[in-house]
Amino acid sequence: MEQKWWHNAVIYQVYPKSFKDSNDDGIGDLKGITSKLDYLEKLGITAIWLSPVYKSPMDDNGYDISDYEDIASIFGTMEDMEELIAEGHKRKIKIIMDLVVNHTSDEHAWFIEARENPDSPKRDFYIWRDEPNGIISAFSGSAWEFDDASGQYYLHNFSKKQPDLNWENEELRHQIYDMMNFWIDKGIGGFRMDVIDMIGKIPDQEIISNGPMLHPYLKEMNQATFGDKDLLTVGETWGATPEIAKQYSNPKNQELSMVFQFEHIGLQYQPGQPKWHYAKELDVPKLKEIFTKWQTELGEEEGWNSLFWNNHDLPRIVSTWGDDGNYRVKSAKALAILLHLMKGTPYIYQGEEIGMTNYPFKSLEDVEDIESINYAHEALEKGVPLEVIMDQIRHIGRDNARTPMQWNDEAEAGFTTGRPWLAVNPNYKEINVEAALADPDSIFYTYQALIALRKEHPWLVTADYELVDAADKVFAYKRVEGEQAYLVVVNLSSQEQDLPLVNGVEEVLIANTKVEQVLESGKLAPWDAFCVKLA
């Protein structure tokens, strides 16, 4: 395998609206991000994945784009963006842009023209039909919206203000590639591609994901834009299997660097149930099975894994699968150690490195997320009690990840001196960056150490993965390269568990516990986690 910079990189996702406000309007912005680059450099990350900062009406927090080559005024200016890229480069931190090309905003110039003039070439940039079929929007209800002006329906797989683009139109595709090259020329480090598996859809057959033209489009995109550049490209692919992931990320196919698979995230939901029916506890044996499949079936010559627990669409991992009460710090460290020592490129979501938690939403008035609000109204109409809906939003709602970054214990957690666009989690007095940096035993320093290990130890990129037999609630695996083996053991529970057999420890690489005591007792205390080099 030809090694690229992203094989031993660690990526940090910034949700700009909630990261750091520099002008006291209560909304995070580009200057705010630039002001915190020294903090991210201290953490040790290689690149920032920046959620969308393009011009947008903000119906879906920037994933509804009205101009791909301009910056939303709430985030700043193009000069601010160029400064962020330049200041990042000074610290060896690349900026990865969020590429949202399944849909635009209905306020994009293309859609405005398509709507106003049915004879315009831009009309075919979108998907219009005389009658709707059965496609359901990801945000509830029909995915078809009637347009009074032209008497046709347009497709929107998300909000009705996010009309889907028609990738069958060659002129549209080349306009998108021109836009990508505009950003590449600005010096960005790559693209995270939003719901990229949907661009090959066949609406008339109700095929939304993984359509037959998906991979030809990606090959064409690769050749027209980033293919000859040293950029990271990662696709969001909810339905991917290892075999599908190989199609995207096998270097021979000349498509993407890697994809985000969500099979492990599916364990947050009850089997066979829609998203809002969350699972009461983690099925650890199933988690072991899923990760082992991806670690062993997506070989390094055939593709590459993305490793993540959190993003802007998911609840906080320490609240979902950790224990955000008695064992918040220890369980956050355990989950980090488990993930970061696997094979692949790890992604950290802002606040994960200090153990930020879900928000205690009390009423629908606290909620900003369009997906949660739409679901709540639909569920109320079906007679679901409000207290059940609020419980679901507290566990699964996307706003859990979007509360402002907690920088210190001052008003509004140091995020803003204004009124924040979304309420700060009330636990910011205890959980914040300033406190984490002052505590040598904080979660932050575990993440910092894991990132340093990845930079120092080539085996983290190249060594094979082997699952180790252990108790149901214990996830243990080896990374093996030639005669050398490294053992990772994590107790994913708040109860004591039996330690799997460990033969001959040469060195402790990282731990959230006293490994010598664990080895002597043969017992793992709640949330014990460590990695050792075996003799």
Predicted regions and their residues:
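Acidic/aromatic-lined carbohydrate-recognition and catalytic surfaces
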Residues: 2-177, 181, 185, 196-251, ...
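Loop/helix patches that line or flank the sugar-binding groove of alpha-linked glycan CAZymes
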Residues: 5-6, 225, 232, 239, ...
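Flexible loop/turn segments at secondary-structure boundaries
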Residues: 56-57, 103-105, 198-203, 240-245, ...
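Aromatic-lined glycan-binding groove of carbohydrate-active enzymes
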Residues: 189, 292-313
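Active-site clefts of carbohydrate-active enzymes
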Residues: 202-203, 304-325
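Beta-strand-rich binding/interaction modules
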Residues: 496-514
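C-terminal beta-strand-rich structural cap/linker in extracellular carbohydrate-active enzymes
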Residues: 519-535
